[in-house]
UniProtKB/Swiss-Prot annotation:
The lineage of its organism: Eukaryota, Viridiplantae, Streptophyta, Embryophyta, Tracheophyta. Pfam families: ANTH. This is Putative clathrin assembly protein At4g40080. GO terms for cellular component: clathrin-coated pit; clathrin-coated vesicle; Golgi apparatus. Its main location: membrane. One of its GO terms (biological process) is clathrin-dependent endocytosis. Residues 29-167 form the ENTH domain. Keywords: Coated pit, Cytoplasmic vesicle, Endocytosis, Golgi apparatus, Membrane. It comes from the Eukaryota. The keyword Membrane applies.
Length: 365
């Protein structure tokens, strides 16, 4: 616990104690696992800006994935209720961090319940685009993090739906050779659709706010770490797909070439910002190799660096994937519902170890 620096901090601590005490009292008088998960959510999402959710509480929440579907559903409902009923930026950020941990470390049954909540779906999935906490300068700064982080996680879930598995999930079993064979069986259209989604996710990652000046650095650092891990996972996926397009370079249609060029340009525009986010040496050689592959693919499909202008003139008539079109598709693909199942366990492999690069809990970048 950080020290109390304002009356608002004191009120937040009192609220934490009151809500946790009430939940603990009720939980002690019942055998319901639902109340146990609810208590862990409360303990993981305190009003304290100096600490992210504790590993012990995260482990209890993630354990909901080892039970029944009803158990997993109740755990997700507790998280979402906490997220949607709070007006505190710290509580909201910690709730979003829990969601991110479920995507990365949760078992499939828990991830599945997260992906279908709410059943109706919607573009503003986490409903935080208008979030404002005006209690203090710090809360005002952290509010921008809440709005961005919620949108980023919406993109992460959307991209996962397109890919057919959860990006950056550590529940991976398929080896590199088998995975590459699966990718080679995809059509150009499927590959381009997946590349478009992955690049869109990295573009959203680039919009991460600057570190708050007034405090909350530990929360921001934790989020940056998680996003950095997603960055590594995303370029793993892109690497395989760009290699596949190298093999198909002589058979690409003009339209496919245009879409690939657009994706490469969008990706390159992210490079500098992504390097700022991921500024350490972890996997630095691999990351540099990926950007080298991007340059190589550009050259293979026609000295594109020199011919971008000519190709771009054709885009207007061809129908570039612009933002309006992407937004129109977002709602349709965001939630992984039972009526529109994702290919988790069939030909698209639900558990894939891209290049056998396990993403650990340590700071990657």
């Amino acid at each position: 616990m950080g020290r109390i620096t304002s009356f608002a901090d004191l009120i937040g601590r009192i609220k934490d104690k009151a809500s946790q005490s009430k939940a603990a009292l009720v939980s002690s008088n019942t055998k319901s696992k639902t109340l146990s998960f609810h208590l862990s959510v409360l303990r993981a999402t305190t009003h304290d800006p100096s600490t992210p959710p504790g590993n012990r509480h995260l482990a209890v929440i993630l354990s909901a994935g080892t039970g029944s579907r009803a158990t997993a559903s109740s755990a997700v409902e507790s998280i979402m209720e906490r997220l949607h009923t709070t007006g505190d930026a710290c509580v909201a950020l910690k709730s979003l961090i829990i969601i991110h941990h479920i995507v990365k470390h949760g078992r499939f049954i828990l991830q599945d319940q997260l992906s279908v909540f709410p059943a109706s779906g919607g573009r503003n999935y986490l409903k935080l685009s208008a979030f404002r906490d005006e209690k203090s300068p710090l809360m005002w700064e952290l509010s921008s993090w809440v709005r961005w982080y919620a949108l980023y996680l919406e993109h992460l879930l959307s991209t996962s739906r397109i890919m057919g598995f959860f990006i950056s999930s550590t529940s991976s079993t398929i080896h590199k050779e088998e995975y590459e064979e699966m990718v080679s069986s995809l059509t150009n259209s499927d590959l381009l659709r997946e590349i478009d989604a992955l690049v869109g996710l990295l573009e959203e990652a680039c919009k991460i706010p600057d570190l708050p000046f007034s405090g909350g650095k530990s929360l921001a650092d934790k989020i940056t770490q998680l996003v950095g891990e997603d960055y590594v996972s995303s370029i793993n996926e892109l690497y395989t797909r760009f290699n596949e397009f190298k093999e198909r370079s002589n058979t690409l249609s003009f339209g496919d070439t245009i879409e690939l060029v657009c994706a490469l340009k969008r990706l390159e525009s992210c490079k500098e910002r992504l390097s700022e986010i991921c500024h350490g040496n972890w996997k630095r050689g691999w990351i540099d190799g990926f950007w080298g592959l991007v340059l190589e693919v550009k050259g293979i499909i026609g000295n594109l660096e020199d011919n971008y202008g000519q190709i771009e003139k054709s885009i207007v008539g061809f129908g570039k994937r612009d933002k309006g079109y992407e937004s129109a598709r977002f709602t349709d693909r965001l939630i992984i519902g039972y009526s529109n199942p994702v290919r988790f366990s069939s030909g698209r492999f639900s558990n894939v170890d891209r290049f056998n690069f396990p993403v650990s809990g340590r700071v990657l970048c």
